[in-house]
């Protein structure tokens, strides 16, 4: 099932994509900070992330710039501890020091008012609150690929992004995220987070390679001492085991439909060549 959202910029339930794994993994990280807290999910989109965090948060607000999106989110997610409101990153409709945690995933690259956004988020965040934000690293996401995302107004290089957050928050923890399609073999009896060995290759040669560059940077920031959950000290993997199988099945289905359609129409093409003169 594909989303009704063809741009891929906003994840919706029903999406089957790399973005699905990336976004859900980020929300799983955020969940570690939200237990019994007041939480803000800024640029919440259709609200799936707000809903996920609501299962752990005391209260949660989802804010989005698009009014119709907010209306639909209210209808779709109606838990007692959830509310949705219209607003943007420079004008959040809540009083000062409202939230224990603010989450903002893949938002800052969609505009150029970066200082205004962080200033506004800091306003609604409690003095000892935690801010969790992510954005693609321009070098890996754009420069290395040679392709620009037309929906991104101002991407940041990793150092620029980290420096921006550090101007507003005294304590930060930096995480890197990379989508990987591959096979993961681990030692079942190991109790430590041992260094990983990465391999790459083909049918002719398999060899050790460097760890992939993180495509996205996630920063956890606070002006209070950061208490990092034990699980965050470990590397984590989001597994969608049927991801490739589902895509393969979908494309096979499309291919079969094409072949059947071609077979049905082929006799008509032959007759057309016989009976229809050129120019008719």
Positions of predicted regions on the chain:
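A short His-aromatic
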Residues: 106-110
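Conserved N-terminal segment of class I S-adenosyl-L-methionine
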Residues: 1-97, 101-105, 115-118, 178-179, ...
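C-terminal helical/coil "lid" or tail adjacent to the Rossmann-like core of SAM-dependent
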Residues: 184-204, 224
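A short glycine-rich, Lys/Arg-flanked "PGG" loop and its adjoining helix->strand segment in the class I
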Residues: 115-130
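A conserved mid-domain beta-alpha-beta active-site/ligand-binding segment of alpha/beta enzyme cores
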Residues: 197-201, 209-210, 214-218
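Short alpha-helix
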Residues: 153-168
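Conserved S-adenosyl-L-methionine
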Residues: 169-181, 198-206
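Short, glycine-/aromatic-enriched active-site segment of Class I SAM-dependent methyltransferases
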Residues: 132-154
């Amino acid at each position: 099932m594909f989303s009704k959202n063809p741009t891929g910029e906003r994840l919706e339930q029903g999406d089957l994509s790399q973005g699905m794994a990336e976004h859900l993994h980020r929300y799983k990280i955020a969940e570690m900070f939200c237990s019994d807290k007041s939480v803000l999910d800024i640029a919440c989109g259709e609200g799936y992330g707000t809903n996920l965090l609501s299962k752990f948060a005391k209260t949660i607000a989802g804010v989005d710039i698009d009014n119709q999106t907010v209306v639909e989110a209210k209808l779709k997610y109606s838990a007692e501890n959830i509310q949705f409101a219209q607003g943007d990153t420079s004008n959040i409709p809540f009083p000062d020091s409202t939230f224990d945690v603010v989450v903002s995933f893949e938002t800052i690259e969609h505009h150029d008012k970066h200082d205004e956004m962080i200033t506004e988020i800091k306003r609604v965040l409690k003095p000892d609150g935690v801010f969790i934000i992510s954005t693609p690293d321009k070098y890996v996401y754009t420069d290395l690929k040679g392709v620009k995302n037309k929906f991104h107004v101002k991407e940041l290089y990793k150092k620029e992004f980290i420096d921006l957050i550090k101007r507003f928050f005294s304590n930060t923890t930096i995480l890197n995220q990379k989508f990987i399609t591959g096979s993961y073999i681990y030692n079942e009896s190991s109790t430590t987070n041992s260094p990983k060995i990465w391999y790459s290759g083909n049918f002719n040669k398999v060899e050790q390679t460097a760890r992939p560059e993180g495509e996205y940077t996630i920063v956890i920031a606070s002006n209070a001492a950061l208490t990092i959950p034990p699980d965050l000290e470990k590397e984590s993997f989001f597994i969608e085991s049927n991801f490739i199988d589902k895509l393969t099945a979908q494309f096979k289905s499309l291919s079969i439909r094409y072949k059947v359609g071609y077979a049905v129409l082929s006799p008509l093409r032959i007759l057309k060549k016989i009976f229809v003169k050129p120019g008719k």
